[in-house]
Structures are given as C-alpha cells and as structure tokens.
Amino acid sequence: MLLRTVILFALAAVAEIGGAWLVWQAVREGRPWWWAGLGVMALGAYGFIASLQADASFGRILAAYGGVFVAGSLVWGAVVDGYRPDRWDVIGAVVCLLGVAVIMFGPRGQGA
C-alpha cells in the first residue's frame, strides 16, 4: 500500500503541477494557447489519478495530497524554472511531507 500511495501521489503531482504550469505558460509567458488546453487535460488527469488511492476518504486524500503539492511545486520550480528554494522553503516542504505521512499512515483504531 505504501508504494502504491507514493506512486499515485507522484503521478498526481506531475499531472496537477504540470497542468498548472502549462496554463501559466500560455497565460503569463506568451506560449501558444493550445498549451493551456494541454494543461486543462493534465489537470483533469490529476482528478482521475487522485481517485485511484486505496483510502475511500476524499477529504483525507486531498488533504494529504496538499502536502505533496507543496513539496512537488518547489521541486518542479527548481527543475523546470530554475527556482532555488531557500532553507525556509525546504523546511516548510519537509513539514508538509511529515503531515502527509501522519494523515496517510498514522495508526487508526476503530472509530478514529
């Protein structure tokens, strides 16, 4: 379950962050408008990918994914746009990923 969860979160991050980046490029950076169309399709794929998580709780999955989105956005910016996260960016991303781990893998008893 851990590997599947991580893979699905990574795929969702690529789809959502990549989709948003494509729209940004079309709107803000003067790229062709069809880039925005590809971005919208990628954002739709993100919604589908997120629904493949084993946990049935929409709120839990999306809340946990939020932490992945924070860290993934910083990585995307560094790799694709040359953005250099500072130590506070990195610390914030680590805190978010710790939150993801607590939400997704914290021990839950009956009724928790």
From Swiss-Prot:
It is found in: Cell membrane. It is a multi-pass membrane protein. The chain crosses the membrane at residues 6-26, 32-52, 61-81, 87-107. One of its GO terms (cellular component) is plasma membrane. The keyword Membrane applies. Pfam families: UPF0060. The keyword Cell membrane applies. InterPro entries: UPF0060 (IPR003844). Keywords: Cell membrane, Membrane, Transmembrane, Transmembrane helix. It comes from the Bacteria. Belongs to the UPF0060 family. NCBIfam families: PRK02237.1 (NF002586). This is UPF0060 membrane protein CMM_0279. It comes from Clavibacter michiganensis subsp. michiganensis (strain NCPPB 382).
